[in-house]
Amino acid sequence: MDITPALTEMELDHKPTCETVPGLPQKKHYRQRAHSNPHSDHDIEYPLTPNHMDWTKYYGDYTKGRQVDFADIGCGYGGLLMRLSPKYPDNLMIGMEIRVKVSDYVNEKIQALRKHHAEAGHYRNVAVLRSNAMKYMPNYFHKGQLSKMFFLFPDPHFKNKKHKWRIITPTLLSEYAYVLREGGIIYTITDVKDLHEWMVKHLSEHPLFERLTEEEMKKDPIVEMLFESTEEGQKVTRNDGGKWPAIFRRLPNPAL
């Protein structure tokens, strides 16, 4: 059977996280509603400032000489993180997830993968924390700390009165611009055309972001991972749905 290099690479990407790894949690025990109200009181602990954040609780001594610089916002069951981790072993990456059971699942999965690959030291660069990124992003990250931020299949909040709850808004984009370094990248993808247009509109109108061209997107190896790495993306594929990516670059601050 003829197998293309792209397919072989995809199989290799998924091999380390397959169900044959001992101790992997079963997703059926960690099911929770697809989205959570970001404005509810979730009793979440968070650091007073980034200086109060102890990342060694998540990465151990792997933090030596490193800072977290990839952030997957609303990481779900961690599919993208598991794809990114072995490809970018020198980058610390964090998944931020508001749902308790889902973040517990991702943590258990990471611990199982670390144990299984202990000799090689794989997956030490990935972690998850339960938090509300819409409220506490600046509490975790210093100015210009992040190089990449991911927003994959976020809650569309269809009703007009709930659009203010969307993860991409003018106010939130200013916070993202604060923690994202110049030249850093925001990756978005959704299966909801209206939400795609909303995100593109607000990112395009913000003075600190510019959209990547089609040619630039083709050269970025991460872009292809956005489509199928997550459970939500795979579900959209099974249902023959459309997917719309939009990638933006953080521009330099304007001269004073």
Swiss-Prot record:
The active site is at D155. One of its GO terms (biological process) is tRNA modification. Pathway: tRNA modification; N(7)-methylguanine-tRNA biosynthesis. It catalyses: guanosine(46) in tRNA + S-adenosyl-L-methionine = N(7)-methylguanosine(46) in tRNA + S-adenosyl-L-homocysteine. It is found in: Nucleus. It comes from the Eukaryota. Residues 17-45 are annotated as: Disordered. Its EC number is 2.1.1.33. This is tRNA (guanine-N(7)-)-methyltransferase. It comes from Caenorhabditis elegans. The gene is metl-1.
